[in-house]
Amino acid sequence: MKNLVVVDHPLIKHKLTIMRDKNTGPKEFRELLREITLLLAYEATRHLKCEEVEVETPITKTIGYRINDKDIVVVPILRAGLVMADGILELLPNASVGHIGIYRDPETLQAVEYYAKLPPLNDDKEVFLLDPMLATGVSSIKAIEILKENGAKKITLVALIAAPEGVEAVEKKYEDVKIYVAALDERLNDHGYIIPGLGDAGDRLFRTK
């Protein structure tokens, strides 16, 4: 798992434990997902380049640094990735936002695309793909395929929880994609859910079950 980074931080561990609790309601669940995404983004954006700029303080002129966040694209996988987008956009408010709609067929466990709306992509764009659960990896792989078909070259996948099977599947298909997660869990069960995981993130976010 050479491309995997597990962001080890006390705040993330604390907040993720509350999210795992089956008694945590949707309002708190949404807030925690947004907060953890913000913390993950701190590490996932570490490779971004800064440009020198001159700035005038109340005392004197000096050299500072700015990120050109207009070259950054945030792409949540619908539905559950939407809340993650809110977290990363707090740090990068000028980033472009695309959306990819994918669901996992419960019988075949294959990814089915139902929507894609993306801003212009090219070699210079830094794309952050957001999906809370990296389980089998099929949804993330499908989303990366769509991004690459539309011109994306620099893609970083940010997830809340991953299973080893999902990480290995993404790495096998796309060696150039870095993966940042809050936790690497034990395994998948027979239904493709992460163990111990936190259940279906979308259902818990939007109370659809």
UniProtKB/Swiss-Prot annotation:
<comment type="pathway">
    <text>Pyrimidine metabolism; UMP biosynthesis via salvage pathway; UMP from uracil: step 1/1.</text>
</comment>
<feature type="binding site">
    <location>
        <position position="79"/>
    </location>
    <ligand>
        <name>5-phospho-alpha-D-ribose 1-diphosphate</name>
    </ligand>
</feature>
<dbReference type="GO" id="GO:0005525">
    <property type="term" value="F:GTP binding"/>
</dbReference>
<keyword id="KW-0021">Allosteric enzyme</keyword>
<dbReference type="GO" id="GO:0000287">
    <property type="term" value="F:magnesium ion binding"/>
</dbReference>
<dbReference type="GO" id="GO:0005737">
    <property type="term" value="C:cytoplasm"/>
</dbReference>
<dbReference type="InterPro" id="IPR050054">
    <property type="entry name" value="UPRTase/APRTase"/>
</dbReference>
<comment type="similarity">
    <text>Belongs to the UPRTase family.</text>
</comment>
<dbReference type="InterPro" id="IPR034332">
    <property type="entry name" value="Upp_B"/>
</dbReference>
<comment type="function">
    <text>Catalyzes the conversion of uracil and 5-phospho-alpha-D-ribose 1-diphosphate (PRPP) to UMP and diphosphate.</text>
</comment>
<feature type="binding site">
    <location>
        <begin position="199"/>
        <end position="201"/>
    </location>
    <ligand>
        <name>uracil</name>
    </ligand>
</feature>
<keyword id="KW-0808">Transferase</keyword>
<keyword id="KW-0342">GTP-binding</keyword>
<dbReference type="GO" id="GO:0006223">
    <property type="term" value="P:uracil salvage"/>
</dbReference>
<keyword id="KW-0547">Nucleotide-binding</keyword>
<feature type="binding site">
    <location>
        <position position="194"/>
    </location>
    <ligand>
        <name>uracil</name>
    </ligand>
</feature>
<dbReference type="InterPro" id="IPR029057">
    <property type="entry name" value="PRTase-like"/>
</dbReference>
<feature type="binding site">
    <location>
        <position position="104"/>
    </location>
    <ligand>
        <name>5-phospho-alpha-D-ribose 1-diphosphate</name>
    </ligand>
</feature>
<dbReference type="GO" id="GO:0044206">
    <property type="term" value="P:UMP salvage"/>
</dbReference>
<dbReference type="InterPro" id="IPR000836">
    <property type="entry name" value="PRibTrfase_dom"/>
</dbReference>
<keyword id="KW-0328">Glycosyltransferase</keyword>
<feature type="binding site">
    <location>
        <position position="200"/>
    </location>
    <ligand>
        <name>5-phospho-alpha-D-ribose 1-diphosphate</name>
    </ligand>
</feature>
<dbReference type="InterPro" id="IPR005765">
    <property type="entry name" value="Ura_phspho_trans"/>
</dbReference>
<protein>
    <recommendedName>
        <fullName>Uracil phosphoribosyltransferase</fullName>
        <ecNumber>2.4.2.9</ecNumber>
    </recommendedName>
</protein>
<keyword id="KW-0460">Magnesium</keyword>
<dbReference type="Pfam" id="PF14681">
    <property type="entry name" value="UPRTase"/>
</dbReference>
<dbReference type="GO" id="GO:0004845">
    <property type="term" value="F:uracil phosphoribosyltransferase activity"/>
</dbReference>
<feature type="binding site">
    <location>
        <begin position="131"/>
        <end position="139"/>
    </location>
    <ligand>
        <name>5-phospho-alpha-D-ribose 1-diphosphate</name>
    </ligand>
</feature>
